[in-house]
Amino acid sequence: MAKTYDYLFKLLLIGDSGVGKTCVLFRFSEDAFNSTFISTIGIDFKIRTIELDGKRIKLQIWDTAGQERFRTITTAYYRGAMGIMLVYDITNEKSFDNIRNWIRNIEEHASADVEKMILGNKCDVNDKRQVSKERGEKLALDYGIKFMETSAKANINVENAFFTLARDIKAKMDKKLEGNSPQGSNQGVKITPDQQKRSSFFRCVLL
């Protein structure tokens, strides 16, 4: 049977329990919202195929449990991930503070050149906000990664976040393919052009 896609990208959603990872995933994969999801047990995944630059990209998106007791299971899935979304809840200060711990997990268990993005979820609940957008932006800048505020409930920026991450992964892959020589393959993941790309993103998105 012929393949129905040109690329397969494995993505991972990580963050504390209750920040809305499952809701973000369902909004993107099913265009649906359910406020009564129970906490993910272990790990689950959804698939959605999107089109970018005339190519069909199959996104396999893994939703991980945020509880400490599942940490050993979920970190095993970091290794093959090409993109990781770190999710916190803007109404929960602790979930934001823990993003640094989640980044340490990525550094320990994931590929060195994995694409990352921080999502401040539940931005529709502004009256209960504990974490300002500026703090989210600063944290992302500290680590040199992208940031967006999202709402699975109000369908704000969810689609944009996944498409942006997929586009960055594809750009990195294309760059590696272009430089298929021994020197070129290493240069495909140079830090400098990536940082330039990120800085231009912030000028456009974080206004």
UniProtKB/Swiss-Prot annotation:
UniProt: Mg(2+) binding residues: T22, T40, D63
Localization per Swiss-Prot or TrEMBL: Cell membrane; Golgi apparatus; Endosome membrane; Recycling endosome membrane
Motif window: Switch 1: 31-45
Record entry for activity regulation: Regulated by guanine nucleotide exchange factors (GEFs) such as RAB3IP/Rabin8 and RPGR which promote the exchange of bound GDP for free GTP, GTPase activating proteins (GAPs) which increase the GTP hydrolysis activity, and GDP dissociation inhibitors (GDIs) which inhibit the dissociation of the nucleotide from the GTPase. Activated in response to insulin.
Residue numbers of Phosphothreonine PTMs: T72
Post-translational modification note: Phosphorylation of Thr-72 in the switch II region by LRRK2 prevents the association of RAB regulatory proteins, including CHM, CHML and RAB GDP dissociation inhibitors GDI1 and GDI2. Phosphorylation by LRRK2 is required for localization to stressed lysosomes.
Cofactor: Mg(2+)
Motif Switch 2, residue numbers: 63-80
Keywords: Autophagy, Cell membrane, Cell projection, Cilium, Cilium biogenesis/degradation, Cytoplasm, Cytoplasmic vesicle, Cytoskeleton, Endosome, Golgi apparatus, GTP-binding, Hydrolase, Lipoprotein, Lysosome, Membrane, Methylation, Nucleotide-binding, Phosphoprotein, Prenylation, Protein transport, Proto-oncogene, Transport
Top enzyme class: hydrolase
Protein family membership: Belongs to the small GTPase superfamily. Rab family.
Record remark: domains: Switch 1, switch 2 and the interswitch regions are characteristic of Rab GTPases and mediate the interactions with Rab downstream effectors. The switch regions undergo conformational changes upon nucleotide binding which drives interaction with specific sets of effector proteins, with most effectors only binding to GTP-bound Rab.
UniProt-recorded name of the protein: Ras-related protein Rab-8A
Source organism: Homo sapiens (Human)
